[in-house]
C-alpha cells in the first residue's frame, strides 16, 4: 500500500478501561458520528446528555468534534463505566493521531485511568468493611 492510500484510510485505535468496563475505540476520519456496539451513541448511552458530552469531550477540547467518526466496541460494567472507558479510549486514540495532542489532553486529565474499583468482600465480614455487631459480654 502506498503512503497516500494509507493516509486516506487512516484508522486510530485506543483502549480505555473503567471499573470492569473495557472499550476498544476506533477513530476514522469522518463527520463526527458516534457508533457504540453497532448502535447510535445517543441511543446506547440512553439519551443522557452528560454521558454523550463526556465521551466527546476530548475531541471538543482539540476542536475535532466534526473531523472523526468514533466506532466503539464496549463490554463489561454499566453505562457510566463504559462511557468513562470510551472517553479514555478516545483520548488515547487522539494521541496516536498527533503526538502534539498529548499535552492538552494530559493537562485536562483525559489520559488518566481512574483506578477506583469495587473492593472485594472479605470472609467474616458482611461487606467489604462492614463487620457484624460486636458485643463485649
Swiss-Prot record:
Residues 123-137 have a biased composition (Basic residues). Residues 105-137 are annotated as: Disordered. Belongs to the universal ribosomal protein uS9 family. This is Small ribosomal subunit protein uS9. It comes from the Bacteria. PROSITE patterns: RIBOSOMAL_S9 (PS00360). Keywords: Ribonucleoprotein, Ribosomal protein. The keyword Ribonucleoprotein applies. One of its GO terms (biological process) is translation. Residues 109-122 have a biased composition (Basic and acidic residues). One of its GO terms (cellular component) is cytoplasm. GO terms for molecular function: RNA binding; structural constituent of ribosome. The keyword Ribonucleoprotein applies.
Amino acid at each position: 500500500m502506498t503512503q497516500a492510500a494509507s493516509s486516506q484510510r487512516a484508522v486510530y485505535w485506543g483502549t480505555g478501561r473503567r471499573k470492569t468496563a473495557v472499550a476498544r475505540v476506533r477513530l476514522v476520519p469522518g463527520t463526527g458520528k458516534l457508533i457504540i456496539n453497532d448502535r447510535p451513541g445517543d441511543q446506547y448511552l440512553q439519551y443522557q446528555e452528560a454521558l454523550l458530552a463526556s465521551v466527546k469531550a476530548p475531541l471538543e477540547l482539540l476542536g475535532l468534534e466534526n473531523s472523526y467518526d468514533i466506532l466503539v466496541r464496549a463490554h463489561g460494567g454499566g453505562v457510566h463505566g463504559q462511557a468513562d472507558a470510551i472517553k479514555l479510549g478516545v483520548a488515547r486514540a487522539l494521541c496516536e493521531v498527533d503526538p502534539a495532542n498529548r499535552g492538552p489532553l494530559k493537562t485536562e486529565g483525559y489520559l488518566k485511568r481512574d483506578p477506583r474499583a469495587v473492593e472485594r468482600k472479605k470472609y467474616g465480614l458482611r461487606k467489604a468493611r462492614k463487620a457484624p455487631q460486636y458485643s463485649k459480654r
